Amino acid sequence: MTQKNTLLLIDGYGFVFRAYYAQQPLTSPKGEPVGALYGFTSMLLKLLSDFKPKHVAVVFDSGGKNFRHYIYPEYKANRPPPPEDLIVQLPLVRDVASNLNFPILEKNGYEADDIIATFATKTAALGENVVIISSDKDLLQLMSENIKIYDPLRGKYITEDDVVKKFGTTSDKLREVMALIGDRSDNIPGVPSIGPKTASSLITQFGSVENIFNSLDQVSSVKQRETLQNSREAALISWQLIGLDSNVDLDFQLNNLEWSPPNSDKLTGFLQEYGFRSLYKRAENLFDIKINDHKDIVDNKVTEIKEISNKLELENFAKDAEKIGIFGIYLLQHKGDNLAFILSLQNQSYIIKISNTSHDLFSYNAKNNNDWFSDIIFNLLADKSIKKITYSLKPLLKFYANQSHEITAIEDLELMQYALSAGLSQKNLFEEALKEDNRPLSKLAYREEFKGDTERSTAAYKSVREDASTGSTSKLPLEVEFGKRPIVINESARIVANFISLYKQNILELKDNKAFRLYSDIDLPICFILDKMEKVGIKVDANYLKQLSTEFGAEILKLEEEIFALSGTKFNIGSLKQLGEILFEKMQLPFGKASAKASSYSTGAEILEKLSEHGYNIADLLLRWRQLTKLKNTYTDSLPKQIDNITHRVHTTFLQTSTTTGRLSSQEPNLQNVPIRSSEGNKIRQAFIAEEGYKLISADYSQIELRILSHIANIDALKQAFINKDDIHTQTACQIFNLQKHELTNEHRRKAKAINFGIIYGISAFGLAKQLNVTNGEASEYIKKYFAEYKGVQEYMEQTKAFASSNGYVTNFFGRKCFVPLIHDKKLKQFAERAAINAPIQGTNADIIKIAMINLDQEIEKRKLKTRLVLQIHDELLFEAPIDEVEIIIPIIKKIMEYSTNMDVPIITEIRTGNNWMEIH
C-alpha cells in the first residue's frame, strides 16, 4: 500500500480500545483477560501485512494530565473510567508492540495526537510521506499532500471530500469549525446551539474563530450574535484544546523508526503465553517462522450417548465438568413441557429424563420429583469457574426460577448465531456442523418428524445401531414420554454433543465479523433482563376488562343488526366469502374484484374504505364491526384468561431472535401491539394498572428514529434542528407547505409528521398519497421538497439500497448486520429495499434501548431499589415503582436512557407517571 520511505504512525490506545470493543472477552491459559491484547495483536499483524512499512511507530498516551487540563480543568472530565477487564490489560499493550518489533513513542504530559502531529509534520518537512492509522477526527487537521489519514474502521484513506461532507469544511479549517461545534466526548464546550452546518458557514464567511469575534457586528443573525457573544471564552478555550502541538520535545530520528522482523522465539513465546493460537498461522506466513502446538478447534465425532438415571452418575459427571471447565446443556421441551436435560462433555452426551412436565412458570418448582438431579445441575449452572454452553437460555432460567442464586458463565449459541445473522432463517444454522439435518434444533428430536418417511426413520435407527456396534452404550433409541407418545431424543443428544465445538467456531466467527460485543454486551445480558421482566409481569384489571368486553359486545350486536338491515339478510359477517357475495352480488356495490387466488371477492380494509368514501354506510359499519371484534377477541376476552392464578398478573414472552433488526417482539400475549390511536385502544390500556402502593412510569424516546437518521446519514439540517430543540415536524411543515410557523395548522403538522416518519420507511409517492389523502403528484412533490430540505437523506437511501444489493445485508450504528435475503427477489425487491433503508435506523433504536435497559437494571440493582421494568414497547420502557421511589427513579431513568450512547444530536426521553397505562399516554 505505501511507498518505500513512508512512515506509518499508529494511534496505539485508539487501536487498543477499538480492539477491546470489537473482540470477545478472551482469557489466557492463566485466566487473565486478554481480549484487547488479542485484538491489538491481530490488528498490528494486519497492518504489517497490508502496508509492509519501512518506518513505523506505535504512539501511546502517557496517561495522567496534560497541558490541556491546565487550560481547561474539565477537559475529558465526563469520560467514565475504562472497564476493569481492560484496565488490567493496558500495561501489557506495549509488550504487544515490542514483541512485534514496533518502535514505541510516548512522552509524559502529552497525548498521542500531539506526538503524532510532531513526527508527521517533521517527516513531511523532509519530503517523506506519512500515513497516520487512526479513526480520531482530531488528527484530520494534519492532512496535507504528504500526510494521509487511513481509517482502519472503514479500511480506507480519508479524503478532503470526506472531511467536507462530514464537517462542511476542509481539513485546514477543521480546528476552527470544531472549536465552534465542541466535542461532547472530550467535554470541549464549543458554542451552544451551533452545529456543523452553522459552524462551517461562519468559518467560510470569517475565516477563523478569532475573526468571528473581531467582527461580531457582521453576524447577520441576532440570535447567533448573542450566542457567540455569550460564549466567546468557551469558543477560544475550545480552539486551544482542539489544536495539536506539533513541537513536542522528542528526539526525532527517522532511522530510529525502521522496522525489522521480530525475534521468532520471543514472538512464539508471547503468542503461546497468552493462548493466541488462532494467530499462529498468520504469524508463520508473515514472518516465515514455525510455531508448534497447533490444536484442532473442532471435533464433531460423537462417541457415546448415555442416560444418567441416578445421583451418583450425575455427581461423577459434575466432577468431570469441574476438571474440564466447560460442558454443554440443553433443556429439551415440547409445547412448553420439560422433557429432558441433555448434557455433553468431550463428545459424550448424557440424558436425564424429567418426570414432572408441568411448565407453569410459578407453580412449577424445579425440584418436585426431580430432587436427585435438580440441585446438582443448578450448582453447575451457578459455578462461575465452569463455562456452560446452551441453545436458548431462557428455558433454563425459567426452570430454575425459584433459585436464590444466578446462573453464571453461560453462553447461548442461539444468541451467538443471531448476532451474526439477524434476518437469516435460523433453521440452517446448525446444518454445516451437524451434517445430518437442517431443521431447527428444537424440532430434531421428535419421531413425528419421521412420520410417513420410512427411509428417514430407518436411517435414524440404523445410525444408532451402528453406534452400538462401535462401542456406544446406546443400544436403542432413547425415548421420553410426551403424553402417551414416545419421543426419540438421540438426534437432540447428537446436536448437544457438538455444542462446545460450535461455541468455539462461533467465537471465531463473531470475532471475524466484529460482532462479539453485540452478543456479549447486549444480546446475552438482555436475555437475563427479559427473563426477569417475564417473571414480574404486569397487573391487569380483569373486572374492568370484562365490563369493557360487555360494552364492546353490545355495540357489536347493534352493528350486526344495522348491517343486516342494510343488506336485507342475515349472514356470517366474519365469512369473507359470504360478505363478498352480499356486497357485490346481492347489493351490487361497485369495486367488486375477485381475489386472484380464490373464488371469493376482496373485502379488505382498502375496498371497504373506498366504498365508505363513496357514501356506502354499510362499509363504515363493517369497518367498525371489524375493529371492535378484533379488540374484543384479542384483548377484552383473552387477557383475563391469561392472568396467572398465583401472581394475578399477565406474563408475556419476549422474543429476541425473531426480527431482522434486533428489535424485540412479544407474544402470548403480544403486549407491544396494544392499540393507542383510538379511544377504544386507550380504554384497553386503562386495564393495565399499577400494583397497590405503586405507580406506572412510562419513559419514551422522543423522535428517536429521526435523531438516529440525522446521525447515521449525517443530515446537517436535521442535526441542527435537534441541537436547537426545534419542533422537527413544524420545521418540515414550513418547508413542505411554504408557510411561516404562525400560518401552520394542526393538519399541516400532522401531514409533516407522516412525511418525516414515512420517509424513514422508504414510503412511495403512492403510499404517501394514500396516507395523506392527496394526489400522487402532490405526494411526489412533498417527497421532492423533503429531499431538498434535508440534503443527504436521498443519498443515504440510495447508498443503503446499493450496499444491501451488493452484500445482502446492512449494518446499524453498533455494527449489527441486518440481513435482507429478499433483496434480489424480483417480486419483493421494493419491499426489501424499504426494509434495508429502515433496518439500520430501527436496529440502532433497538440496540440503544436494550443498552439502556441493561444499564438501568444494573443501577436499580446497585441502589437496591424495588422499581421494576415490566414492559418494553420498542422505544418505550414501562416501569412499576413504589410511590416513595418515583421521585428517585425518574432522574435515573432519564439520565441513563439519554446517555446510553453517544450521537451527534441529543437523545431526549419523555417521562410520565400514572396509575394505569392510559393515564401516561
Curated annotation (Swiss-Prot):
Q: Which family does it belong to?
A: Belongs to the DNA polymerase type-A family.
**Record protein name field:** DNA polymerase I
Which reaction is the catalytic activity of this chain? DNA(n) + a 2'-deoxyribonucleoside 5'-triphosphate = DNA(n+1) + diphosphate
The 5'-3' exonuclease domain covers 1-283
Which keywords appear in this protein's UniProt record, sorted alphabetically?
Answer: DNA damage, DNA repair, DNA replication, DNA-binding, DNA-directed DNA polymerase, Exonuclease, Hydrolase, Nuclease, Nucleotidyltransferase, Transferase
InterPro entries given in the database record: 5-3_exonucl_a-hlix_arch_N, 5-3_exonuclease, 5-3_exonuclease_C_sf, DNA-dir_DNA_pol_A_CS, DNA-dir_DNA_pol_A_palm_dom, DNA/RNA_pol_sf, DNA_polI_H3TH, DNA_polymerase_1
Q: Please cite one Gene Ontology biological process associated with this protein.
A: DNA-templated DNA replication
Q: One matching Pfam family, short form?
A: DNA_pol_A
Per the UniProt entry, the disulfide pairs are none
Oligomeric form and interacting partners: Single-chain monomer with multiple functions.
Reported function: In addition to polymerase activity, this DNA polymerase exhibits 5'-3' exonuclease activity.
State the EC number(s): 2.7.7.7
Residues in RPE1 insert domain copies: 439-486
Query: Which EC class, in a word?
Result: transferase
**UniProt-listed PROSITE patterns:** DNA_POLYMERASE_A
What is the superkingdom listed in this entry's lineage? Answer: Bacteria
One annotated GO molecular function is:
DNA binding
Respond yes or no to whether keyword DNA-binding is given for this record.
yes
